């Protein structure tokens, strides 16, 4: 296959591109700045063809045709944590994927769209509602598609993952009091392999919605404690203060902590069913803490989050 990976230089996209290339597929990488992107890519991916892609400009079907030329499958691994200038949630998460799906339907290409677990219609975060709007537009487009919803990702090179590891090292863990939801932490390398395997399967109704996660489902507090590997003082941050801080972080573009993520942490974000073992042909990698502790939580935690 010839596969275009949009966002192929990012935390998720790099893993997807590497897994596809390891399986013998021709990988093309869509990036905002191809020359700078080539320098950031690992050596194994530097010979990939790079194509310039600014999703905020690709909001009509015709704008996609040149970018998609010669590709069999398109993987959209682009997302923004916060809006910046022309890069708005509506354009990047909703309008651009809508136009991309229309272009894929027109050209008979398969679209694999990476979204997130826990999206709800009445969420109070534009970050979340724009992602849900994008999902719904893709599902209605007529294109052969798969929407992939991973849980929290662990691995090197991720802004959020690195930030959580840093927080875990603190002797005091400040955890929002309403962050009671469980998260099925998974390795980003497993996500890359799973998406590569998904691309090799025939597009069908069975694979239209794919939820992925690890086999354990800790709360945020449990995850931080296990990552630290030794006891830490836990301070429950009141709801009003956690929300205020999340909005301030959004305004200042400071840290990965956002109001959207706070909303997600309020409810379980676990796959139901979990397609990861089936796609990998094995059990997911264990997420091991610095102290050597492996999460071993009851399987009953892996349930459909309440709406």
For every predicted segment, state its role:
Residues 6, 30, 77-78, 111-116, ...:
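SDR active-site strand-loop-helix element
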Residues 3-25:
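N-terminal Rossmann NAD(P)H-binding glycine-rich loop of SDR-like oxidoreductase domains
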Residues 35, 44-98, 103-105, 117-121:
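NAD(P)H-binding glycine-rich loop region in Rossmannoid oxidoreductase-like domains
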Residues 159-160, 177-200, 207-211:
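Substrate-positioning beta->alpha
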Residues 198-257, 271-307:
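Mid/C-terminal beta-alpha module of Rossmann-like enzyme folds, strongest
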Residues 115, 136-157, 166:
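Conserved beta-loop-beta element that borders a ligand/cofactor-binding pocket
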Residues 162-188, 231-271:
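Alpha-helical membrane-targeting segments
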Residues 13-15, 94, 132:
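Residues forming the Rossmann-fold NAD(P)(H) cofactor-binding site
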């Amino acid at each position: 296959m010839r596969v275009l990976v949009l966002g192929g230089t990012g935390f998720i996209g790099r893993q997807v591109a590497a897994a596809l290339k390891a399986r013998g597929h021709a990988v093309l990488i869509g990036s905002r700045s191809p020359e700078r992107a080539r320098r950031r890519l690992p050596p194994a991916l530097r010979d990939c063809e790079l194509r310039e892609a600014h999703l905020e400009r690709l909001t009509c079907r015709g704008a996609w045709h040149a970018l998609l030329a010669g590709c069999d499958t398109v993987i959209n691994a682009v997302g923004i944590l916060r809006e910046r200038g022309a890069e708005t949630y509506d354009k990047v998460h909703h309008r651009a994927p809508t136009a991309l799906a229309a272009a894929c339907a027109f050209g008979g290409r398969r679209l694999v769209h990476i979204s997130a677990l826990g999206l709800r219609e009445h969420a109070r975060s534009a970050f979340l509602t724009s992602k849900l709007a994008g999902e719904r537009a893709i599902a209605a487009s007529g294109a052969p598609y798969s929407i992939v919803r991973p849980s929290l990702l662990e691995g090197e090179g991720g802004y959020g993952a690195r930030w959580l590891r840093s927080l875990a090292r603190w002797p005091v863990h400040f955890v929002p009091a309403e962050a009671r939801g469980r998260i099925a932490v998974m390795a980003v390398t497993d996500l890359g392999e799973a998406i590569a395997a998904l691309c090799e399967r025939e597009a069908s109704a069975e694979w239209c919605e794919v939820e992925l996660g690890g086999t354990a489902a800790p709360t945020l507090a449990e995850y931080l404690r296990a990552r630290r590997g030794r006891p830490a003082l836990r301070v429950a941050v009141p709801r009003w203060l956690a929300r205020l801080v999340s909005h301030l972080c959004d305004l200042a573009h400071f840290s990965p902590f956002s109001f959207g993520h706070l909303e997600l942490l309020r409810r379980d974000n676990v796959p139901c069913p979990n397609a990861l073992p089936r796609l990998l042909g094995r059990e997911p990698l264990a997420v091991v803490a610095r102290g050597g502790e492996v999460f071993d939580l009851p399987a009953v935690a892996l349930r459909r989050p309440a709406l």
